[in-house]
Structure formats: C-alpha cells, structure tokens
Regions:
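Nuclease catalytic cores that cleave nucleic-acid phosphodiester bonds
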Residues: 18-168
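N-terminal amphipathic/basic-hydrophobic helices that include classical n-h-c signal peptides
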Residues: 1-17
C-alpha cells in the first residue's frame, strides 16, 4: 500500500486527463470493478483511499492509498485532495456534502449523484435513519448491492464521466 501523498496530475498530452477517487472501505466491490473497467477504456486514474489495507486491482491506472487509522481519516484525505473536475465515489452523505461544497462531483455506489440541490434532503434522510437505528426502531445498513444498483451505477458513471471529460 502507498502511504498518503497526493497523486500527481499529469498533462493531458498522453497523460492522465482526469481522476476518480473511491472511498474504498465502504464501496461495494462491484462498483470498484466498474470504475476500473471504465478507467481502462477511457484512460483515467483511479485512486482508492482506505483506512485499512486492501487488495488493489493490478492495473497501472489504479493506486491505493492507506491513510492512518482514525475517525474520518479517509474522508478528510478525500476532501483535502480531490479537486473540482474530478469524481469521488462514496456512500457517506456527510463526506459527499463536504465534497459538493468544494465543487467536487460525488456519486454513490447505487448511481445517485450528490448535488447542491439534493444535499439537504439526503442529509435529513441520513440523520433520520441514524436516529431510528440508535433508538432500535430500524436495522442497520443499506440493502445488498443488487443488479439494479449495478446498472444504475454504470449508467450514472458513464453520464458523469462524459460530462467531466467534456469540461476538462
């Protein structure tokens, strides 16, 4: 695993044209695999940021950064290093809120893009579910990542990458 440092952004003359970051600890493997498949086809860099060591796909376009453990260490790293024009894949709503406020595009592994227009609603729903879980009125976690989610994610990823590459 690579120690924390900012990956270099190369000029678009044959180098990396864009970067997709993944909050790797919570991202389903199917979503990570889909991003890597797109990266191989469209020639962009994928940076997995994790709080614990993981198996990194063995492609040159993929980097793994393991941050020191601690609450929100991976989130803080993503907010510090991702820049507008890049995409972050995350299911963490407070993290997405921080990224969107910075102008970074964020997408959840089920294919729903976070935006300034939907952030307050998504934060409210997240807080409600957290409260219900803490009161024992609801089980923990989202449902399993199914085929419908995989397709919605692939479609949203394609749409967002196309948009970001046009803006680059």
């Amino acid at each position: 695993a690579v120690r924390p440092q900012s990956p270099g952004r190369e000029a678009s003359s044959g180098g990396i044209s864009m970067r997709v970051w993944i909050d790797a600890d919570a991202c389903p493997r199917a979503a990570k695999d889909q991003v890597v498949k797109f990266a191989l086809k469209r020639q962009f860099e994928v940076v997995l940021v994790a709080g614990q060591s993981q198996i990194k796909p063995s492609f040159a376009c993929v980097k793994l950064i393991v941050v020191p453990s601690g609450p929100d260490a991976a989130d803080d790293y993503l907010v510090e290093h991702a820049v507008p024009g890049e995409l972050v894949i995350c299911s963490d709503v407070p993290l997405a809120d921080r990224l969107v406020k910075k102008g970074v595009t964020a997408l959840d592994p089920r294919g729903k893009e976070f935006s300034p227009a939907n952030m307050s609603e998504r934060l409210a729903v997240r807080n409600l579910f957290t409260d219900l879980r803490e009161q024992g009125q609801m089980g923990g976690g989202p449902p399993p990542h199914g085929e419908k989610d995989k397709q919605a994610f692939a479609n949203a990823l394609d749409r967002i990458l196309t948009r970001l590459m046009r803006q680059a």
